[in-house]
Amino acid sequence: MKFGLFFLNFMNSKRSSDQVIEEMLDTAHYVDQLKFDTLAVYENHFSNNGVVGAPLTVAGFLLGMTKNAKVASLNHVITTHHPVRVAEEACLLDQMSEGRFAFGFSDCEKSADMRFFNRPTDSQFQLFSECHKIINDAFTTGYCHPNNDFYSFPKISVNPHAFTEGGPAQFVNATSKEVVEWAAKLGLPLVFRWDDSNAQRKEYAGLYHEVAQAHGVDVSQVRHKLTLLVNQNVDGEAARAEARVYLEEFVRESYSNTDFEQKMGELLSENAIGTYEESTQAARVAIECCGAADLLMSFESMEDKAQQRAVIDVVNANIVKYHS
């Protein structure tokens, strides 16, 4: 198993955008000296639940300030971007970092974002699929020549061509059954989301294997990723209380049609939150539910930076001890 960090970069009344970004950069610099494999950046628009609307831009900065870790977009929303521009930027990052960039992408999860960016909501998945085909063609061949309902233009060279043979490593967020089925047919790794339940993760993992098998796709070497929030404290209730404050605005906005206490309880129990024993057991169960090969963690809900570093150090020591 490989381990990394992901950054949600939530704002709230105690955290301004400049503070959030500074904390991300500080943490990235610190963990780059440790044994973590990947740093991934979350994309969000028009709310406090993430201040980064351009994860490839942030990835470029992180690649420039780090030497060891891979850097990834966690969920670059390709449905609301022009695919050629996405491919150009991703290949440029791949070239300039000599292969340290990974391309994590997603369909758009918010219909309001689709409308704002003037994208067709009635054919969203078809657009998502066509965007990825253009990007993937650019990654694998250096060229693209689409002729579909959304994009049609002569064959072009997407410059620079990728440094990595076949293009940057790719993974897609498991945002719906439709996306999971699509990914399985292509043998693309999934990202299981931290705010999905274990039951949802297990369902998606089972669906992926079922569809892959039905289409003769060998997924034995596919490395799915799981994202989890981490908040450890010798006082488990203190860890849960702190994480609850961190998540409250997100839950109220993103799950407005769901019972608040039920969803909050699910997040607190099915992420790595509590004492060391409670959090490691929760992580173990989540990994077993989805069969992920890689784990990405966010430590951002921990306000005390000394405590946050101490927990990161413990994880790093376990990586050295058990996974080197």
UniProtKB/Swiss-Prot annotation:
The keyword Oxidoreductase applies. Keywords: Flavoprotein, FMN, Luminescence, Monooxygenase, Oxidoreductase, Photoprotein. InterPro entries: Alkanal_monooxygenase, Bact_Lucif_Oxidored, Bacterial_luciferase_CS, Luciferase-like_dom, Luciferase-like_sf, Luciferase_bac/NFP. Its EC number is 1.14.14.3. GO terms for molecular function: alkanal monooxygenase (FMN-linked) activity. GO terms for cellular component: cytosol. It catalyses: a long-chain fatty aldehyde + FMNH2 + O2 = a long-chain fatty acid + hnu + FMN + H2O + 2 H(+). It comes from the Bacteria. It is an enzyme of class 1 (oxidoreductase). GO terms for biological process: bioluminescence. Pfam families: Bac_luciferase (PF00296). Belongs to the bacterial luciferase oxidoreductase family. Heterodimer of an alpha and a beta chain. Light-emitting reaction in luminous bacteria. The specific role of the beta subunit is unknown, but it is absolutely required for bioluminescence activity. PANTHER family: BLR5498 PROTEIN, LUCIFERASE-LIKE MONOOXYGENASE. This is Alkanal monooxygenase beta chain. It comes from Vibrio harveyi. The gene is luxB.
